[in-house]
């Protein structure tokens, strides 16, 4: 059998031709003289049909019956080489199918644990290494890949340089209570929460930089939106205003959505994602509302029949129900800007004339997906940053390199970060973030 293989996703290019596919058997059915094979190869799914008389005619009765019997007894996830003629077939949901005329078993699969029936979440997570093979899980990972590809493409086209920040650090970029600590040759070190502080150094050297890699948060959270290890894209840029930063973030998110539509249309179809709704998010401008305006809106509507959130006062932080209501109220991704400084990071620049608010923004995704981006302008004045650190009782010695950036040619600069898994969850339309990463790490899960 020829081993010059064709990927399933490329099969439509070979209608009327004989091809060979390397694939796994996702499912099979049929009876008597006919067998149907549901095949997958990582690029897509496809159906093959085998007719017993065709095998007898091609190979003779003994060998033909033996090969057809092999097909009839294939078990789920057996790997095979399968050869046949690609034929158009309107009855097939693919629009074409493979008329199988030869098969070779590569690797047998016995008692595959994830069968086509329903399974509980814990069972599926315990078998995550196998669950990834299922149709929907494959589709989610294909969307993840499309979003990552679009990330690199967007930043390349917008003049950014990939800048690799360290994973081990002696300081905290965000909340020091959420750090994973390790021993670094006798010195305490921490797994990175964000590459931002180092990226600011990159922005002072290279103008526009971004990084993409794993970050770690020791949050004891069990929500559907939190992981302890996830992949973060951080970007930093010099000489940009706050409004220009929001423009850039909006363009980036729209590029990611478009990237998924362009590169993973079959995946979106498998997940039954409303592509017209995604296109609406691209076509319409994102809404921008201040934190205080958002609080006023929440208070004005808190007694409406369809609301389900707790009362908030000015100065309170939003919970997930508040974020959901705000983004659904506007119907498009919504920037909430200028939060209170009291619950934002030390490095954020105050709003001119209003030191109790900072020049920051969270982008809230509609449909209940909540925050997907956090960004801000950074405090670029040395004395102001030192005063803020002293106010918070921070150890300046751990941030000398960061303060140096304000001593030697400081400029207005800002940046933002996006957890790729949250973006994948939003674009894919899935309900839980654990499916947006190949092997999720959560409060009580570190295997497989």
From Swiss-Prot:
Matching InterPro entries: Aa-tRNA-synt_II (IPR004364), aa-tRNA-synth_II (IPR006195), aa-tRNA-synth_II/BPL/LPL (IPR045864), Asn-tRNA-ligase (IPR004522), Asp/Asn-tRNA-synth_IIb (IPR002312), NA-bd_OB-fold (IPR012340), NA-bd_OB_tRNA (IPR004365)
Catalytic activity, as annotated: tRNA(Asn) + L-asparagine + ATP = L-asparaginyl-tRNA(Asn) + AMP + diphosphate + H(+)
Domain of life (superkingdom): Bacteria
GO biological process: asparaginyl-tRNA aminoacylation
Gene3D superfamilies: Bira Bifunctional Protein, Domain 2, Nucleic acid-binding proteins
Gene Ontology MF term list: asparagine-tRNA ligase activity; ATP binding; catalytic activity, acting on a protein; nucleic acid binding; transferase activity
Record keywords: Aminoacyl-tRNA synthetase, ATP-binding, Cytoplasm, Ligase, Nucleotide-binding, Protein biosynthesis
Membrane keyword on record: no
Chief localization: cytoplasm
GO CC annotation: cytoplasm
Location(s), subcellular: Cytoplasm
Coiled coil (UniProt feature): none
Subunit relationships: Homodimer.
Protein name: Asparagine--tRNA ligase
Taxonomic path: Bacteria, Bacillati, Bacillota, Bacilli, Lactobacillales
Gene responsible for this protein: asnS
């Amino acid at each position: 059998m020829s081993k010059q293989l064709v990927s399933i996703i490329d099969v439509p290019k070979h209608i009327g031709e004989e091809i060979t596919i390397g694939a796994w058997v996702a499912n099979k059915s049929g009876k008597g003289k006919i067998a149907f094979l549901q095949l997958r190869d990582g690029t897509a799914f496809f159906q093959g049909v085998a007719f017993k008389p065709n095998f007898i005619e091609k190979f003779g009765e003994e060998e033909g019956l033996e090969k057809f019997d092999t097909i009839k007894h294939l078990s789920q996830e057996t790997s095979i080489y399968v050869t046949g003629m690609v034929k158009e077939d309107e009855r097939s949901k693919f629009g074409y199918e493979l008329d199988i005329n030869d098969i070779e078993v590569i690797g047998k699969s016995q008692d595959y644990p994830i069968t086509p029936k329903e399974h509980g979440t814990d069972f599926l997570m315990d078998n995550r290494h196998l669950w990834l093979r299922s149709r929907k899980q494959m589709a989610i990972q294909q969307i993840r890949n499309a979003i990552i590809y679009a990330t690199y493409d967007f930043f390349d086209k917008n003049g950014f340089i990939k800048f690799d920040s360290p994973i081990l650090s002696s300081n905290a970029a965000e909340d020091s209570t959420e750090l994973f600590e390790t021993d670094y040759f006798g010195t305490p070190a921490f797994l990175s929460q964000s590459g931002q502080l180092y990226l600011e150094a990159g922005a002072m050297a290279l103008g526009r930089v971004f990084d993409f890699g794993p970050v770690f948060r020791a949050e004891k959270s069990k929500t559907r939106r939190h992981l302890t290890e996830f992949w973060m894209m951080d970007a930093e840029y010099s000489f940009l205003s706050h409004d220009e930063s929001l423009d850039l973030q909006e363009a980036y998110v729209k590029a990611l959505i478009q990237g998924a539509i362009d590169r993973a249309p079959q995946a979106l179809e498998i997940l039954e994602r409303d592509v017209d709704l995604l296109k609406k998010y691209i076509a319409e401008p994102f809404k921008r509302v201040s934190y205080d305006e958002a609080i006023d809106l929440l208070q004005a509507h808190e007694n409406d029949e369809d609301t389900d959130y707790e009362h908030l006062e000015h100065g309170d932080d939003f919970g997930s129900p508040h974020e959901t209501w705000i983004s659904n109220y506007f119907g498009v991704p919504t920037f909430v800007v200028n939060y209170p400084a009291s619950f934002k990071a030390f490095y954020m620049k105050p709003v001119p004339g209003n030191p109790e608010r900072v020049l920051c923004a969270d982008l809230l995704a509609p449909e209940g997906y909540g925050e997907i981006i956090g960004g801000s302008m950074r405090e670029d004045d040395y004395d102001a940053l030192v005063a803020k650190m002293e106010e918070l009782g921070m150890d300046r010695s751990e941030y000398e390199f960061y303060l140096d950036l304000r001593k030697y040619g400081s400029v207005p600069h800002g940046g933002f970060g996006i957890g790729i898994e949250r973006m994948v969850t939003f674009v894919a339309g899935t309900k839980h973030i654990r499916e947006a990463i190949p092997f999720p790490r959560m409060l009580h899960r570190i295997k497989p």
